[in-house]
Amino acid sequence: MAGRSGDSDEALLQAVRIIKILYQSNPYPKPEGTRQARRNRRRRWRARQRQIHSISERILSTCVGRPAEPVPFQLPPIERLNINCSESGGTSGTQQPQGNTERVGNP
């Protein structure tokens, strides 16, 4: 895979194989029995699926070495932040230059 070393490729492939085995070990329940029995089997199946999903996330985060969540948005330095209550356009939260401002729609 591009941008990765061979060792991490093998570790990633091994993690994917483990996750695949986990999901294959929990097949969807068979549609037989009473309505209540089927409902209980589906409920237990969904609970196992949630557990498998959380285990899979832990395996991947350990293997890849980064959290599954995206990196938080980087804000500009605190000195450049201000509260602007005007209705003019521009990026909110950052100071705009005080030069010529063109207003659309004003005569």
From Swiss-Prot:
Residues 18-26 are annotated as: Homomultimerization. Pfam families: REV. Residues 36-50 have a biased composition (Basic residues). Asymmetrically arginine dimethylated at one site by host PRMT6. Methylation impairs the RNA-binding activity and export of viral RNA from the nucleus to the cytoplasm. Phosphorylated by protein kinase CK2. Presence of, and maybe binding to the N-terminus of the regulatory beta subunit of CK2 is necessary for CK2-mediated Rev's phosphorylation. Its main location: host cell. The modification Phosphoserine is found at S5, S8, S92. The keyword Transport applies. InterPro entries: REV_protein. Residues 86-101 have a biased composition (Low complexity). A motif (Nuclear export signal and binding to XPO1) lies at residues 73-84. Residues 26-50, 82-107 are annotated as: Disordered. Homomultimer; when bound to the RRE. Multimeric assembly is essential for activity and may involve XPO1. Binds to human KPNB1, XPO1, TNPO1, RANBP5 and IPO7. Interacts with the viral Integrase. Interacts with human KHDRBS1. Interacts with human NAP1; this interaction decreases Rev multimerization and stimulates its activity. Interacts with human DEAD-box helicases DDX3 and DDX24; these interactions may serve for viral RNA export to the cytoplasm and packaging, respectively. Signal peptide: none annotated. It comes from Human immunodeficiency virus type 1 group M subtype C (isolate 92BR025) (HIV-1). It comes from the Viruses. One of its GO terms (molecular function) is RNA binding. One of its GO terms (biological process) is mRNA transport. Gene3D superfamilies: 6.10.140.630. The keyword Phosphoprotein applies. The RNA-binding motif binds to the RRE, a 240 bp stem-and-loop structure present in incompletely spliced viral pre-mRNAs. This region also contains the NLS which mediates nuclear localization via KPNB1 binding and, when the N-terminal sequence is present, nucleolar targeting. These overlapping functions prevent Rev bound to RRE from undesirable return to the nucleus. When Rev binds the RRE, the NLS becomes masked while the NES remains accessible. The leucine-rich NES mediates binding to human XPO1. A motif (Nuclear localization signal and RNA-binding (RRE)) lies at residues 34-50. Belongs to the HIV-1 REV protein family. GO terms for cellular component: host cell cytoplasm; host cell nucleolus. Keywords: AIDS, Host cytoplasm, Host nucleus, Host-virus interaction, Methylation, mRNA transport, Phosphoprotein, RNA-binding, Transport. This is Protein Rev. HIV-1 lineages are divided in three main groups, M (for Major), O (for Outlier), and N (for New, or Non-M, Non-O). The vast majority of strains found worldwide belong to the group M. Group O seems to be endemic to and largely confined to Cameroon and neighboring countries in West Central Africa, where these viruses represent a small minority of HIV-1 strains. The group N is represented by a limited number of isolates from Cameroonian persons. The group M is further subdivided in 9 clades or subtypes (A to D, F to H, J and K).
